[in-house]
Amino acid sequence: MTSTSPKSRKPSTKTTKSKSKSKSKSKAAKAAAAGASPALARTPPQFRNRVIDKKALKQLVAWAYKTHGTAVTASMADNLKDLGFRYATQAAVSISVEDLKVPEAKQDLLGQAEAQITATEECYRLGEITEVERHTKVIDTWTETNERLVDAVKKNFNQNDPLNSVWMMANSGARGNMSQVRQLVGMRGLMANPQGEIIDLPIRTNFREGLTVTEYVISSYGARKGLVDTALRTADSGYLTRRLVDVAQDVIVREDDCGTTRGIIVKAEDGGFGSRLVGRLTAEQVVNVDGEILAERNTEIDPPLSKRFEKAAITEVMVRSPLTCEANRSVCRKCYGWALAHNELADLGEAVGIIAAQSIGEPGTQLTMRTFHTGGVSTAETGVVRSTVAGTVEFGPKARVRGYRTPHGLEAQQSEVDFTLTVKPSGKGRAQRIDITTGSLLFVSDGQEIEADVTVVQIAAVAVKKSVEKATKDVICDLAGQVRYEQVIQPREVKDRQGNITLKAQRLGRLWVLAGDVYNLPPNAEPVVQGNVKVERGQVLAEASQASEFGGEVRLRDSIGDSREVQIVTTSMTMKDFKLLGESTHSGELWHLEAKDGTRYRLNTIPGSKIGNGEVVAELADDRFRTQTGGLVRFAPGLAIKKARSAKNGFEVNKGGTLLWIPQETHEINKDISLLMIEDGQWIEAGTEVVKDIFSQTAGIVTVTQKNDILREIIVRSGSFHLCTETKALERFTGDGQIVNPGETIAKGINSEAMVFVQTVDTPEGTGLLLRPMEEYTIPNEAQLPELTHVKQPKGPHLGIKATQRLAFKDGELIKSVEGVELLKTQLILETFDTTPQMTVDVEAVRDKRAKTIERLRLVILESILVRRDTISDSSHGSTHTELQIEDGQSVKASDVVATTQILCKQEGIAQLPVVQEGDPVRRLIVERDEDTITVTTNGSPLVEVGQRLVDGDSLAKDEPSSCCGEVEEVDGKAITLRLGRPYMVSPDSVLHVRDGDLVQRGDGLALLVFERQKTGDIVQGLPRIEELLEARRPRESAVLCKKPGTVEIKQGEDDESITVTVIEADDAIGEYPILLGRNVMVSNGQQVHAGELLTDGPINPHELLDCFFEDLRGRKPLMDAAQEAIAKLQHRLVTEVQNVYKSQGVSIDDKHIEVIVRQMTSKVRIEDAGDTTLLPGELIELRQVEDTNQAMAITGGAPSEFTPVLLGITKASLNTDSFISAASFQETTRVLTEAAIEGKSDWLRGLKENVIIGRLIPAGTGFSGFQEELRAEAGPHPDILAEDPAGYRRMQNLRPDYTVDMPAAPAASSTAVLADPSDADLEATRSRHGIDPAASNFAAFVRPTGENELEEEQLPDPSALEGLQQEGLLTEE
């Protein structure tokens, strides 16, 4: 489509009105009529005969807009819409089941895939490939089949039914895409399980044919994952956008041109060359090969110019970029380039930061959280080269190859360098030359004779080593039998830091499992048969016995169901002096023990339960120590307690004595004080209502406790009250009070007959003494214990009962209660003197032997033995038969056998015992049955020996292949006996779970295959990857990076495990990089490496990368240049990485958006040494600010500051902005504001957020001119002069703050370059240009300050000059 000059953009005024009414006109004619612009009038309408699909329609509208402006485009789009609807109505495009046509080729393709997979399974069965290689091959086969099926679908529609509705919709871009059509008429393909692993059973059907139940369930996995992912993505994407907006909100286009000479280089090799140049400005002349200038510096690159560059074979162009813009704290128009909304240079005041943030954040929801790992390399990446001639392969002298096994288990060689391979023909003809790149796979060897059309090499698409990750897969045994290693494996023991030993295979080789019937033996079973002995069916193979630990009386439970429990009573004790009485109450059964004298003990347990050592069996039911109310406990001298293990059990009495009890009634109340019905200190009678609905139970003096008008407690203290004025007596009994003995004088005229407790109290009548009565409780020294009868076994644990007295309270403790409490409890406690802490005792009720009506309590210690049941033959244990060796009531000694279990043979054969370490028990044995061997008779003489292992197809005799896998057991003439088996391939470094000679059951794990799978960048993908890049996260196990350039040498450690990569640098210094275990070295000996290059695989730490670049450049360049170049390298890398993620998902974002964000992340440096500047070490400062400061130091001769560049993630960068208002509104508000207050920060309100928060107009869009006006107003009284004289204006703006001016000084806003004072010649030129009288010139007012910043007398402007200025109207009164 042609494009006219941009000048014809604005349509003529009559455009919009002249909308053609006639429907019969052609589309081109309509467009011409609608937009009769001068350009169209001059050029004949173009005729394009092609299908217009979505893409072409986009181009058409874009062309119309660019060439003819908005009105014409709108009109044309309207006409196109009418045209489209009209024909859509007539064509009646709809969709029905009939439209879904399945290609006939599908069955053939599926058949081919099935055949390939059968072959793969056969290879696996013969032990030629590992489980991992099988899985990879199956998945790759299905992936390839699916792709071929898609091609078949396209071909079928194109050839047989091009107007099919489904095909038209998908093809034109109206609705749907190929992947959906594929599922409708191709096959759904492979699905992932919830862990993200691919299930190697694909969905072969499509929605037209319908899914089977299994396929339906498998496909619902993916559906669920899709829904959940979408829900999570929305939130993550929103938060990413918020952080991006926050970091870039103050990036506004504030200048026309910053004047920088720097730029970034866009290279053709990075892809998308033309489209990446459009909308940029060139940073230097672009010259083609012949020296012709294609574009001058600062030329806007539009699509035609970018096409010219591509035609002229230009490979790189230096363009201006936000990354290199030198505008202070903003971006200039020329560095930013086109605003993509209207394809013209961005206007001043455009908020490009926010546009950038939204452009990156918005596609976030489209990115998948992570796609699935599809196994091997897809065929698209690699090119297979076949031989064109038959002949001999020659590698040539430069070739370096190493052995390699492909992911599908094929043996090949991998090239380590680039070289040329030649196939020399055996007859006449030209030799075939193939260029081999590093990493290509060769399927032929040097000197090999090959035929024509043989796969020679698989060329690696790009000579790049992909990073890999370790993964594991279990190898599960398919049959029971005995494990045999092949010698090749060379297993070795590896000890880790914890001292655990694992067995690892050193080489690729096979594990064999030779068939047999494996029996699992129960613990403590001993084999009865010897190795290599013939056994019959039903013969005992092993025997296990169960013995009693303590011995005692046997008690066989009545067969409850099928319980096989044998109980042995080890120790028992009957309480003969107590009757056991039970009674039923509403709360359950209550049991009592009644002694002969009638005392009763409450039983704490019930018969049939278990109790442990130290637990209470029974408690004395005794009311002698029960009080009426709460009160105060006092111990008389002599009463001693020892603290129990826990206070909740109370305190054990050591020595008896007297316990004193002072009763008082305590009501705990939480009610409003208004409900109180008595007053503090008042005397009340029993039954008085103290608070609404609460009555006192005793008479006495009331004490009320309240807090914040809420009643807490009401205490009633009973006793006799005496008013008293004697100060000495009152003082004596103040506080806690005192005990007074009988007959002792308390105060004048107050005596006591009994022992009392005296306290001073205040009442409404006055202060006096309260004599409180005391109760005495006598506690005996020891609790009385009735007679008990013991039965003690010689070896069994001892059983006893101990009586203890326990006090519930300590001396001086106040019990707040209205009801009474029990002060002393007498308890019977169980004692077992046994070593095992978990020993429990059974409580039983037994009939008395003499008096049958009476029940007694019996405590017994039981040993319980569970006897195995008989099992009829099961797959792993064989038949077992168990016999009891005892009878009910029999007495057995310790370690007597109670029961024996026999393991019986299921089928006759030869029994063998496994090889075990000395002292280890035998846990399994194997019987080799007749069905585990096969005898083959050969025609010729056998070529095999005993012990040799064969797989299908191996020769038994000449031209006689074997039909099964196994080990040769004997060769008798021409009869060969094979023991059947199954080989399993294990790869190097696999962990072996079994040793040579071990016995395994079906389903046991044999080994753990450790394999490397390529990370095709899809492990962390989509949003998480973008976030990782923009937050500059440090990866956990990052790659080792080269710090200085040089030549690589790889050294193996002594233990063959550790590797050290040494780099011999330019000045012969040696850099050593120890490589951790399990890391892949990405370089080879003699290779030249650069700073920041990967030495091992793994994710790159961006911070470390920046350090590598900077340290390398610092030695060769000035500090400032080194920092700028290091930052530029990192910026390029970050932009590329972010773009790669978006491109992989098919999202296109213009580079400049990412550049704006990356610029914010890399704008700061950390001060290391401040020199003579006012900066602080460790401070984060803008690079440009440091540059200005160091320039000033260079002028004054001070020492400049030293610094290192830093990379900040978007969150950190947002929190480190100059504006504390913006930072505080983002995160960690308190911390940001506190720090700002402590440092006394000022916020210059440069960004959008700060102004919105304060409530000002934002300095962007239309508000930008207002912002500029402010600057100009500050700049001086002559805005017209400044506008006409930009040099003068810039000088005014750039005056340093320590100039004194008789008007507000301009802030250094647009540039921080320090300019000299205006020279006399400059001033003269400006005055004469504007016809200003020198006496009245505003420049006369500029003067230099002194050190004290005060103007000296003679420096003051001449008063007459000022007067002249006022008269001219150039200076106001102010």
UniProtKB/Swiss-Prot annotation:
GO terms (BP aspect): DNA-templated transcription
Feature: compositional bias, Basic residues: 7-28
EC number: 2.7.7.6
Species this protein is from: Prochlorococcus marinus (strain MIT 9313)
Compositionally biased residues, Low complexity: 29-39, 1362-1374
Annotated residues for binding of Zn(2+): C258, C325, C332, C335
Region listing for Disordered, in residue ranges: 1-47, 1344-1374
Biological function: DNA-dependent RNA polymerase catalyzes the transcription of DNA into RNA using the four ribonucleoside triphosphates as substrates.
Protein keywords: DNA-directed RNA polymerase, Metal-binding, Nucleotidyltransferase, Transcription, Transferase, Zinc
Cofactor(s) this protein requires: Zn(2+)
Catalytically driven reaction(s): RNA(n) + a ribonucleoside 5'-triphosphate = RNA(n+1) + diphosphate
UniProt-listed InterPro entries: DNA-dir_RpoC2_beta_pp, DNA-dir_RpoC_beta_prime, RNA_pol_Rpb1_3, RNA_pol_Rpb1_3_sf, RNA_pol_Rpb1_4, RNA_pol_Rpb1_5, Rpb1_funnel_sf
SUPFAM superfamilies listed in its UniProt record: beta and beta-prime subunits of DNA dependent RNA-polymerase
Listed name of the protein: DNA-directed RNA polymerase subunit beta'
Membership in a protein family: Belongs to the RNA polymerase beta' chain family. RpoC2 subfamily.
Keyword Nucleotidyltransferase (UniProt): yes
GO cellular component terms given for this protein: DNA-directed RNA polymerase complex
One MF annotation (Gene Ontology) recorded for this entry: DNA binding
NCBIfam families noted in UniProt: PRK02597.1, rpoC2_cyan
